[in-house]
Amino acid sequence: MTNKKFILNADDFGMSQDYNRAVLVGYEDGFLRSASICANGPSFESAINEILPECQELSLGVHLNIIEGKSLTHCPLLTDEKGNFNNGYLAMILKSNNREFLSQTEKEFRAQIERVQAVAKPDHIDSHVHVHAIPPIFKLVCRLAKEYKIPYVRTQNEILYAVDNKKKTCTLAYGVNIIKNLLLKFFTMQNKKLLPQYGIKTNDYLIGVCYTAMMNSQTLEEGLKAIEGDNIITECLIHPKNYAIKKDDHHAEEFKLSRDKLLQDTIYRLGFEISNHKNL
C-alpha cells in the first residue's frame, strides 16, 4: 500500500488582495489546502481577518521574507535607509557567514514569526525566493522552528524534468531555472543533514523551481510523474493571483491550476493523497 502525500502550497499569501482572493477561491472551489503568509505583506491584515476565517482547515505557514518590501525591525545590513529590503540572492549567499548579518536576520525572522503566531498557529516555514535554503540561514531557521514549535521546514529537492512544450522548455528562463534548481539541490543535500538534530519534518520532493513563473496543470502533472517511490511527501509551490481585472499571466494560470478538477483526478490516479502540512 502506498503512502504518497501531495501538498499544493500558495506562497506570497498576504502580499496583495489578488493573492488573498486566490487562496480563498482555491480553497473553496479547488484543492488548495495550504498557504504561506508574508508577515510584512501589504495585505497581511486582510489575509488574517477576511480570508483565514473562511478557510478553517487551511494549513498556514510563515513565508519568511527578507527580499521584498519593508522590514519589521531595524536591520540595516538587510535594507536601505528607508527600511526596504535591498539584497539579492547572491548578496545573501555572500553575507550568510557574517555574524552581524545573521543576527539581524534572526531578529527580523523572529518578528515575522511572532506576528503570525500572535493571530494564528502556523505549522510550516518556507521563504520568499528560497532564501532560507542558504545553509547558514537554514540552520538559523531550523533553530527558530524548534523554539517556536513549528514542525515543518521546506527543502528544495526537485527532480529535473522537461515538459513537451517548446515555449516553456526551450527558453532562457528554463535554463536559468535549471541552474537555480541545481544550486538549491546542492544546498538541500547539506540542509537535510541538520533536520534530525532539530526534530524538523520536511518534504522529500519539491515541484515549482524548474518551471518558476511557468507553472500550470501540465508542468505539475509531469513533475509528479517524474517522482517514484512510496512513503514520500511532495510539495508543489505556486504563486496564484485572482485578479479583480482579468489578466493572462503565470499567476492567473497557477490560480487556474488550483481549481483544475481533471488535474485533481490525475493526482489521485498517480497514487497521491492530497494533504497539507497540519495532517502530516
Segments (PLM) and residue ranges:
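DG-centered beta-turn motif at the end of beta-strands
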Residues: 10-14
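Terminal accessory/targeting
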Residues: 1-7, 17-59, 63-120, 124, ...
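Gly/Ser/Thr-rich loops at beta-strand to alpha-helix junctions
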Residues: 130-134
